[in-house]
């Protein structure tokens, strides 16, 4: 048989069912062009600008580039892997000299384009290396070598590769002469990230079941429009694109439920800032006390910046999944005001319990597990126009995580809002700083919100945009334009001026005394919060309160409850202490950890709090006298804060550095009041200033600074390079340090520096036995991978996250089941039930107290 008996229509790209390389290449380029059309205009303009071409040329070039991503499959070692092709190759006399099952087609793609095809077309070395490198990274972290280059059949396969390139060039570029957009090193980072993200997304869509049978019907000359419509429908049905919405420019247009005469000072000032600033604004930082309407002002700013930069929508990143769950409800209510129901996606590892999934899609690609995770509803939220979730989801965009570029592509289409900026530690702040560098490079507008922010942290968060000394006005809005102009607007009118009574109470190490003090404070009625820094202490104080026979309502709230029980407690917390006063108890004590510190809209008459860094104490004050319309007992005329301190600080340990705790004590020991907001900026500045500390604290401060340095260094090992340092696609297993399995307890790429955690479910023996009967035994362990979606949900609702070290060496193979797929990383443990409590080694699960550990 003649050598030309194998044509491009015979060369396989997919095998089940068969799809030729010609069909897959064409559909991938077509999908890329449809995605391009659906991108916000700002992203089109930016990518075209980075490549120094027009938007029309950008669409053509993208289709051409993406269509060639699998050209490396046109190679003998790769084709030999499929038995049906093997027979055809033998018949045609094209049997390879040796076989290699580890051949990586994307490596062949790079070599074919960079070393031969594009070189022969006259492309400059730096350009062909860059563009080939983008395509070579579309399967991230795969090990193996490229195909054979110098064998007896090389010229035949090289000829087919050249034919494929020429066909795609005519189809997409519509020219005999190839052109290669010029690009300089500083632009290669952002351009490479966008091009790679678009390549991956296009490949996955072309590999989905939309086109599983495309070989039987797709013809570029006859059914091009039909294929385009399929991609468009998928993007629309998936919520991956949306029409540009004009939310208006006035605050009351954006928030139609807030009348013009009801605007708070901050809201008037943010509106004026955008009206008076002519340049495009790159970043806005809003610093204001609790209760000033920061969220509404932040969303207003986000939408104005999206309009300016021709982007669509926003991603709101928050510190925890609990705060995300709350915020998604607020954002859905907001978008419903504009007729955009059901458009907000929720993103965190357990989000699919809260957010209902859309129909699932199958993918015929070796990356189908990742394609499914990314293009099924929960994950693709970062690509959707409106999304809310943990800030980790955005931070992963700059970690060495598989397919992190898809996160950058998603963020590039919208405004990023980072809420509760004060709550992130040194390690997370380093990650956020790198994220902001990429935001600037990709023209992603950013809004940051904070109640209190130390000057040093403020400077760090704004350093990607400016280096000059910052104003310390408070409360204030700081905006930086695209040219680096800094606009600072001091908020002229604050709604809440209060004088908080503050006292130190040295009983932190005595749970019985804390319980007695709490009961005394509300003996004549009132709602009190006892806020402690560690779960064990909260459980002990709650038990002491119950044992002393307190005659009011009590509730314990912390993070070590199973997911469903935690949601119940959160709902009860809001029912009792939230905006609706109809269920507010006459007398109640909530014992809690930091879960009530952030974004929960609850209001207490008085608070007792364990000592913490000063900015966090001020944040906690925001939960006292929060609502003006709350009926209060006569003994509570002003907000009251009782700060619990240790008698023996040297032997007291919690989650905060001793020097910051002791600095708070030092700053408050001679005070009886704090004026909100007047005293806040100076207190926060002094709280983080070593020179304001007494001399005996110097050793603690030095330890703290060394720990900060170590945390800062730790973050760099996980970060991708700054955008200005060129394009560094993650192609090899060595360069991708981490997987992107959010379900696995917590992401293996560290967005937070701390002890590793595991998500566990404690089941009593009979429930465990029933589940174990359905488990598969694989390599000596029992795995759960065949449960229905509802069964998976029921199991995850019973799950709780604990430190991994608490489990070390305890579980035997007979008492543990390992979750897979959506349950990835989950451990199901067999416990023993006694009197409503489930025991497992030194751990016990109690309905009222949550998970407890016994020494």
Locate each region found by the language model.
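C-terminal helicase lobe and adjacent C-terminal extensions/tails of nucleic-acid helicase motors
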Residues: 458, 509-581, 604, 608-855
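Conserved pre-motif I regulatory segment
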Residues: 249-287
């Amino acid at each position: 048989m003649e050598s030309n008996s194998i044509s491009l229509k015979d060369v396989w790209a997919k095998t089940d069912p068969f799809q030729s390389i010609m069909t897959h290449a064409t559909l991938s380029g077509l999908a890329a062009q449809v995605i391009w059309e659906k991108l916000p205009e700002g992203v089109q303009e930016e990518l075209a600008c980075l490549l120094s071409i027009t938007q029309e040329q950008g669409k053509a070039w993208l289709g051409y580039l993406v269509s060639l991503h699998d050209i490396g499959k046109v190679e003998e070692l790769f084709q030999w892997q499929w038995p049906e092709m093997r027979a055809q190759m033998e018949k045609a006399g094209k049997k390879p000299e040796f076989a290699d099952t580890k051949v990586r087609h994307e490596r062949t793609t790079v070599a074919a384009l960079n070393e031969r095809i594009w070189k022969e077309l006259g492309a400059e070395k730096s350009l062909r290396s860059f563009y080939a490198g983008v395509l070579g990274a579309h399967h991230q972290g795969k090990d193996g070598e490229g195909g054979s280059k110098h064998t007896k059949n090389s010229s035949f396969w090289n000829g087919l590769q050249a034919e494929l390139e020429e066909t795609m060039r005519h189809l997409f570029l519509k020219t005999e002469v190839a052109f290669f957009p010029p690009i300089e090193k500083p632009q290669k980072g952002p351009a490479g990230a966008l091009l790679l993200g678009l390549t991956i997304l296009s490949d996955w869509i072309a590999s989905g079941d939309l086109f599983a049978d495309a070989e039987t019907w797709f013809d570029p000359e006859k059914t091009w429009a039909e294929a385009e419509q399929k991609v468009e429908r998928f993007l629309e049905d998936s919520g991956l694109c949306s029409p540009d919405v004009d939310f208006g420019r006035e605050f009351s247009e954006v928030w139609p439920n807030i009348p013009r005469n009801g605007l708070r000072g901050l809201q008037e000032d943010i509106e004026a800032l955008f009206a008076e600033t002519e340049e495009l604004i790159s970043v806005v930082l809003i610093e204001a006390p609790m209760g000033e309407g920061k969220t509404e002002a932040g969303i207003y700013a986000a939408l104005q910046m999206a309009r300016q930069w021709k982007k669509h929508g926003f991603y709101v990143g928050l510190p925890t999944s609990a705060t995300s769950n709350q915020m998604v409800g607020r954002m859905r209510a907001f978008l419903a005001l504009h007729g955009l129901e059901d458009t907000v996606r929720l993103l965190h590892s357990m989000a699919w319990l809260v957010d209902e999934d859309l129909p699932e899609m199958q993918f015929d690609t070796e990356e189908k597990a990742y394609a499914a995770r990314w293009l099924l509803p929960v994950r693709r939220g970062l690509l959707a126009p409106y999304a809310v979730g943990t800030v980790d989801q955005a931070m992963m965009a700059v970690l060495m995580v598989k397919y992190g570029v898809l996160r950058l592509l998603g963020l590039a289409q919208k405004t990023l809002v980072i809420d509760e900026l004060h709550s992130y530690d040194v390690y997370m702040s380093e990650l956020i700083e790198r994220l902001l560098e990429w935001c600037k490079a990709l023209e992603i507008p950013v809004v940051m919100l904070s109640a209190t922010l130390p000057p040093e942290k403020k400077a760090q968060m704004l350093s990607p945009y400016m280096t000059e000394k910052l104003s310390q006005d408070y409360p204030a809005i700081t905006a930086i334009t695209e040219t680096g102009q800094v606009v600072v607007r001091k908020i002229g009118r604050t709604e809440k001026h209060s004088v908080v009574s503050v006292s130190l109470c040295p009983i932190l190490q005595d749970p019985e005394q804390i319980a007695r003090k709490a009961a005394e404070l509300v003996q004549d009625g009132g709602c009190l919060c006892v806020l402690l820094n560690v779960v064990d202490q909260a459980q002990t104080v709650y038990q002491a309160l119950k044992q002393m026979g307190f005659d009011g309502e009590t509730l314990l709230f912390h993070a070590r409850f199973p997911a469903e029980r935690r949601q119940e407690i959160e709902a009860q917390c809001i029912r009792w202490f939230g905006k609706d006063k109809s269920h507010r108890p006459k007398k109640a004590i909530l014992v809690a950890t930091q879960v009530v510190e952030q974004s929960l809209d609850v209001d207490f008459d008085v608070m007792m709090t364990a000592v913490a860094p000063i900015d966090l104490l001020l944040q906690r004050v925001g939960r006292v006298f929060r609502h003006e319309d709350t009926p209060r007992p006569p003994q509570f005329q002003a907000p009251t804060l009782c700060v619990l301190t240790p008698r023996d600080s040297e032997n007291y340990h919690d989650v905060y550095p001793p020097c910051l705790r002791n600095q708070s004590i030092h700053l408050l020991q001679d005070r009886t009041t704090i004026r909100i907001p007047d005293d806040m900026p100076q207190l926060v500045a002094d709280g983080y200033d070593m020179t304001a500390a007494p001399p005996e604290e110097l050793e603690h401060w030095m330890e703290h600074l060394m720990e900060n340095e170590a945390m800062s260094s730790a973050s760099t090992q996980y970060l991708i390079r700054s955008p200005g340092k060129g394009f560094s696609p993650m192609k090899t297993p060595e360069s991708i340090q981490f997987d992107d399995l959010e379900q696995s307890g917590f992401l293996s790429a560290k967005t937070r520096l701390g002890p590793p955690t595991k998500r566990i479910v404690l089941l009593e023996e009979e429930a465990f036995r029933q589940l174990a009967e359905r488990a598969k035994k694989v390599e000596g362990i029992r795995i759960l991978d065949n449960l229905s979606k509802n069964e998976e949900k029921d199991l995850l609702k019973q799950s709780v996250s604990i430190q991994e070290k608490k489990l070390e060496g305890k579980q035997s193979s007979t008492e543990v089941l390992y979750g897979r797929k959506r349950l990835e990383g989950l451990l199901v443990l067999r416990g023993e039930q006694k009197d409503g409590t489930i025991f497992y080694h030194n751990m016990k699960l109690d309905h009222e107290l949550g998970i407890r550990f016994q020494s």
